[in-house]
Amino acid sequence: MSSALQTPMMRQYLEIKAQHPESILFFRMGDFYEMFLDDALVASRILDITLTSRNKNSADEIPFCGVPFHSAQPYIARLVEAGYRVAVCEQIEDPKQTKGLVKRDVVKVVTPALVTESESLTPDENSFLLALCSSGQRWGCAWLDLSTGEFLTANSDNLAGAATLLASIAPRELLLPDQLRRDLPPELALVAGDRPRAAVADWVLDKDYCSKLICSQFGVASPEMLGLAVTELSEALLATGMVLHYLQENRHATLPHLRDLTIVRQNDHLALDPATRRNLELTATMTDNKKSGSLLGCLDRTATAMGARTLKQWLSYPLVQVAPIRRRLEAVEELKENPALQDQLREQLKGVHDLERLNGRVSMAGAGGRDLRSLHDSLEQVPQIRLALTEATAPLLRDLTEELDPLQDIRSLINQAIAPAPPFSLREGGIIADGYHAELDELRAISREGKGYIARMEAQERDRTGISSLKIRYNKVFGYYIEVTKSNLSSVPDNYIRRQTIATGERYITEELKSYEEKVLGAEDRICELEYTLFQEVRERTAAQGGRVSRTASALASLDVLASLALVAQERDYCKPVVDDGDTLEIIEGRHPVVEAMNLGERFVPNDTRLDQEQHQLLMITGPNMAGKSTYMRQVALITLMAQVGSFVPASRATIGIADQIFTRVGAGDNLARGQSTFMVEMMETAHILRSATTKSLVVLDEIGRGTSTFDGLSIAWAVAEYLHDTNHCKARTLFATHYHELADLAATREGITNLTVAVKEWNDQVIFLRTIIPGAASHSYGIQVARLAGMPRNVIERAKEVLKTLEEGEFEQGSPRLSKSSIAPPRKETAQFTLFEQQGDLLRERLKKLNISVMTPLEALNLLDELKKMA
């Protein structure tokens, strides 16, 4: 090891770095965080800061770089965003009171999900850490947003359920046991994508150890007191313990705002697998993963960041119990029908900051004076909101109003203790309000008076000495001093004590000046210490009431969501759906919420839908591409989901029989990374639907079988439709769109299947898609007309018409379609078979011309082929 690394400071650095080899170490050195060696090389490149070195131009050069400690957060955020962990190492002793090397230690490790500073968080999104573990078939999940204190856990009976949870939570960081991290199942890896993955040692998955962590954090005697049954929810218990262990390793501090653990039972919510969430674009679009253009973007008119996050959670976890859905609908209805109340509520909510995250920072001792002031200003809105809701009649509105705690004691404390416009840094001074503490007020008076005395002394000394340029100044090295220029040195009095020679003159002190310096500086030092102590006391007293703040924040967030849904319903003429436990799903004049809201320059054509377990169990939808089949099917799924969220829906009337699951299969891309083609993905997703769907499910299938040959695809689509209709455990309410027109024949043999098609008008060799869903089956696909609309070259369109005409008329030469304009038939061989064909050629040709292939069933085609073979 080089001698440069043998200094006491560098030895200390290397010891601490060895404990955090996977992190970039921010090593506190006075007013800077410094990075050394490889960390410096990485950080300087990513942060675009100067890389320098200790022992420059020697064989023992040590690369290093640094950032100011008071502005380190943006730099930490950039490193975390780039995929690095950052270990923050602080001086844990006061350098002024320490001889020799200052003690240092890591106080926290910042990872993607352990960021709590507001600048590094997306306001309208949770920042979840999700832990996953398994024991055989069962999986445990626990997820925590450290910035808000939301902590949830769940068990899943299978891998598909774990993938569904992962998709719905969309964590910023995954936490896995070592073995699972090395061998993550493909189903989870696909959903996890490129999210950062942290690991805990496999030994952490010990029930006794995890139970101890849980009991310690939540102050209970056993996990069962939180509802975590050791047998029934053992995997959830282990996942929860993983999260707490990870926090213990990386935060090095108590987390009092983690007060509650919510157990999520999957049968309490509408199940939406990853493919369905993606296909319905619930919270982000498929094309660019943006909120705009998604259902969330369409419905989000919330006034607070808390409300925006809560709306996203509601959309991710729709309800399946009628009573709570109706409570939400009644609340939305009252706010919709009372615009004055809605406006007043929204106006007050605009004055509410992110209470959940403010409360988190206060509890973790990370809040500054401005945070406490923001907390105060937010709580100031609560009495007005309670007053506005006094006359509310909807049970949910009344219950939420009761949850609103004005926290008058905390508001008064902050208002009295914290200055109206506190500085950013706690050490700048001026954070405590005048009049709050008698000793502090006295010290401030001394400081102000002392500074005034210094100013008066400067004027007096100028008069006494006749030196008009004499100045009294201050720096940290010499304290207060008198500065005299060279030209006036002959006028310096005898009582001046010289302290320093500078280029422009001399610096002096006097006994009187030093006496006042001690008084003033002593007061200022004491002011800083006292202010910091008082602020900590105020912050701790506020943190002690964090539970009350948390409940109020949750109620405000729910009110914000209800007001947002009411506003959207009012502006877009949505109706209140009737939600029940029946099997009927009936939508009158339904519209697609997102497509309608985007207002693409044309009126959205509404359509009716009826699904039940009798004559309308499976709707077989045929029709041309671009006619609106996919939009129609998605809108039915979205309207169902919106109703179960508790939202009004885009229709003139709707009755929604609760769905336990929604499945969609509406297209896939090649998954080359897993060696799976479009068709393989399509078949896997369809198989999952057939295994999982129940009579209470809603299934949306679009163009099953299109990824393989025509006969294979038709056969698979036919069998899937029969299975969904005939299999008792899987008789799901189904929308089945297909380009195989032969499937329309199923309606003749199965009473639960109804044929629907999209109305089309042909005019002057043009096709007009009317977007209206009508009873019946399509006879044409209008593919060439769609190609024309897509801008295909004219000569390609004309040639396609010729080929289509040839195929439809069944014109054959030598037993093959005559597709080549200039083809010349090869010489015919004289065989008995040829002679036989020639003798019956006219009869066969006439028979083939009359065929209408587009309406033949597979069985009819096979029978005809057998007949023609016998004729030949």
From Swiss-Prot:
GO terms for cellular component: cytosol. Pfam families: MutS_I, MutS_II, MutS_III, MutS_IV, MutS_V. One of its GO terms (molecular function) is damaged DNA binding. It comes from the Bacteria. The lineage of its organism: Bacteria, Pseudomonadati, Thermodesulfobacteriota, Desulfuromonadia, Geobacterales. PROSITE patterns: DNA_MISMATCH_REPAIR_2. Belongs to the DNA mismatch repair MutS family. This is DNA mismatch repair protein MutS. InterPro entries: DNA_mismatch_repair_MutS, DNA_mismatch_repair_MutS-lik_N, DNA_mismatch_repair_MutS/MSH, DNA_mismatch_repair_MutS_C, DNA_mismatch_repair_MutS_clamp, DNA_mismatch_repair_MutS_core, DNA_mismatch_repair_MutS_N, DNA_mismatch_repair_MutS_sf. ATP binds at G623, P624, N625, M626, A627, G628, K629, S630. SMART domains: MUTSac, MUTSd. Keywords: ATP-binding, DNA damage, DNA repair, DNA-binding, Nucleotide-binding. This protein is involved in the repair of mismatches in DNA. It is possible that it carries out the mismatch recognition step. This protein has a weak ATPase activity. The gene is mutS. GO terms for biological process: mismatch repair. It comes from Trichlorobacter lovleyi (strain ATCC BAA-1151 / DSM 17278 / SZ) (Geobacter lovleyi).
